[in-house]
Amino acid sequence: MSLLLGLTCLFVGAPPAGAAVNNITLIVPTTPATGADILARLLAQQLNTKLGQVVVVENKPGASGNIGNDFVARAKPDGATLLIASTSFALNSAVNPNLPFDPIKDFAPITLLGTGTLCLVTPSTLAPNNLTEFIALAKSSQLDYGSPGNGTPQHLAMELFKMEAGVNLFHIPFKAAANAVNDLTGGHVSAMIVPMHTVLPLVKAGRLKMLAVMSKERAELAPNVLTFKEQGYPKLQVDVWYALLAPKGTPAGLVQELNTQVMQILKAPNVVSQLSVHGIEANPSASSTLADLLKMELGRWTQVVKTAQIKAD
């Protein structure tokens, strides 16, 4: 991508030896209209304007995101191919340690892009009106929960909840999040942990109850809903996160310049507000901070997978 070319020209007017000369491609390992895709398209638009270069988004879904992840891991480390990763990036490796790539060794972290809030929701027809009542019901009767599939953030977050709350909920995996939410709304599933913005309209319409959020602080879009920490579960802090990664071996100078440019974009008020509409909080970071996050997430979820005895499909 001419990302390297464009960034370099900002300072010296000419590309260095070995600079990339192609367009920038942001690989999204999910389908369109997901959080990662929405963020990628906004970022591409801003980079187009900022760098004066062509920045395109290419969706490569499949295998829980591993097709796109592996594509970037094998790409030439010249800054022309970048990955929009999300929480699943670490979860996949925790569930399946035999992937063709290493999430730590095969990628160069650039920056955290943003975070989203997860929440625990139940059907409006289910009796509990708060977390304490829900846990009591779960301990006295057999409840279940839905998720978009084995090893997804929603699945593992609920397994973590089960461990911390000491309850046993039966897992019902669906092929898609929309299907799971539909069954939840219809009362066919007892509970779900989901990205808050996807169910907030149903909560406001009285069709679902939101019992807790997994963020560190209360969510701006639902300020009256308590965090798990406020309700006695400090370890239940889990965010959906999005990050920008490059193939391992990408020059350190390019990684730093990408970090600088993207950080400026994500701090712009118009970008912050556009992401907020989709339930994403802009949260750029140093590349070292992202590296630490990836290691922490992989360790955390590997332990959850082991304890819950979760196996790859």
Where are these regions (language model features)?
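Hinge/capping helix and adjacent helix->loop/strand transition within the periplasmic-binding protein
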Residues: 74-79, 94-179, 228, 241-274
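Short hydrophobic alpha-helices and adjacent helix-cap/hinge residues
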Residues: 7, 18-22, 46-50, 124-136, ...
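N-terminal (or domain-start) structured segment
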Residues: 18-105, 142, 150, 166-190, ...
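An extracytoplasmic/periplasmic, membrane-proximal ligand-sensing/linker region
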Residues: 23, 163-164, 252-313
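Paired acidic/hydrophobic, glycine-rich loop segments that form the ligand-binding mouth/hinge
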Residues: 79-85, 144, 190-194, 209-212, ...
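Bacterial N-terminal signal peptides
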Residues: 2-13
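A ligand-binding cleft/hinge motif common to bilobed small-molecule-binding domains
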Residues: 89-98, 155, 160-164, 191-225
